[in-house]
């Protein structure tokens, strides 16, 4: 791509806008609009920048994987996989083989596999949380994962085995933090 590409999830229209950024003028130009067929919100980019993942927050809850055209940033639907709930946040681990997701209304975290071609699969691990799970990220080094619960006022900490795709609660799992 000869210029930066910006991806915007449009929840109300159920679309993803692909925009090209002209850095010298500071303007955006529409490249493509892609139907996501539902309330699309959180998005995450694969570490190699070849796949864009987008979570649909209406039923049936799912994650969509779009292949990114290296020439112009256009998206092509690659795959879709179910999610256990409506997810407020998604992220990938450092290897790009695992999708982390957090459900604000479902009070849970989920771990889903991603195959070598970037296609996600159904969640292999679902972890109940306190109220309003909000985000989930791997730490640098990909050995630990941290998640937040807004309603519980905690940061949750897990050991992460990327080879087998397992999250193990650390002791203590929940670290209390101040509200706000």
Where do the language-model regions lie?
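Short loop/turn segments immediately following beta-strands, especially the blade-tip
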Residues: 19-26, 66-73, 112-119, 158-167
């Amino acid at each position: 791509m000869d210029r930066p590409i910006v991806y915007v999830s449009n929840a109300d229209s159920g679309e993803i806008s692909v925009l090209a950024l002209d850095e010298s003028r500071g303007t955006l130009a529409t490249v493509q609009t892609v139907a996501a067929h539902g309330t699309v919100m959180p998005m995450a980019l694969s570490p190699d920048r070849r796949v864009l993942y987008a979570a649909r927050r209406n039923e049936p809850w799912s994650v969509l994987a779009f292949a990114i055209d290296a020439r112009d940033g256009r998206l092509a639907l690659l795959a879709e996989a179910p999610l256990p709930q409506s997810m407020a946040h998604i992220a990938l681990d450092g290897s790009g083989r695992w999708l982390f997701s957090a459900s604000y209304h479902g009070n849970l975290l989920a771990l889903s596999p991603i195959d070598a071609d970037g296609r996600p699969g159904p969640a292999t691990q679902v972890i109940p949380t306190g109220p309003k799970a909000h985000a989930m990220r791997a730490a640098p080094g990909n050995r630990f994962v941290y998640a937040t619960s807004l309603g519980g006022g905690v940061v949750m900490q897990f050991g992460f085995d990327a080879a087998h795709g397992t999250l193990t609660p650390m002791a203590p799992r929940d670290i209390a933090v101040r509200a706000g």
